[in-house]
């Protein structure tokens, strides 16, 4: 018997009146989290914030509930890491950065990353570890479209190192401290306004910071002060971050994020997907 309101629009007083006509019901209310007026209205009308809902289009919705029943309604506890969007969790030695960056010029051409959010083909990558032995295969099969999966149904996909990985023993040594490592890639963003548009990686059901999930880690190898990451938290609040060379960052790619390189140099990050366990998990919850 619950009533669900999926969107608010119109004059605030009109909205209040319409909701008052349904005062005998239990309510679920969804509002755009970045619309502070509607969030404030929900609280004014006695709704309790339950949590966020994030869409594949990068929208953050706030879910509210109001009970008109004598029976209390409970909701499951959400782990703290689910509310984490981005966090600096460590630093990498300058020797590591210098060793890796010196080899980047010897690498083959980076592969354009097929994505609706990479319309200008500014974002590209190379694989050190992925689902095929070829370094130019940079995708995760489970993220791809049904048409792609049908066309590639006879191809065997399994996690494996590519030949490029042998060029970077320092990367292998660094990642040996993690209990389980999935994809390892160099990701490049072109200068002069190269942009990865606001989006979420909701299609990857394995990702996140919770224990047992795939945590996305970024280590900037080459960057510049005009390279800015913007992330949106679960309340829809934006945060602009510059990841400096040698920083180690966690990024929850299920949350909206955007990258723009307004500098004059390519940005290259070492990007790792590792299972959130042990010290890695502790660094996220501490």
Region locations from a protein language model:
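A short hydrophobic beta-strand segment most commonly corresponding to one strand
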Residues: 215-220, 248-250, 264-281
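Conserved catalytic-core motifs of GNAT/GCN5-like acyltransferases
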Residues: 30, 48-62
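Conserved active-site alpha-helix within GNAT-family acetyltransferase domains
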Residues: 33-51
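Conserved GNAT acetyl-CoA-binding A-motif
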Residues: 22-32
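Conserved metal-binding segment of the jelly-roll/cupin
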Residues: 241-256
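Non-heme Fe(II)/2-oxoglutarate
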Residues: 72-178
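Conserved acetyl-CoA-binding loop-helix of GNAT-fold acetyltransferases
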Residues: 7-21
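A short beta-strand-loop-beta hairpin characteristic of the jelly-roll/cupin
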Residues: 220-244
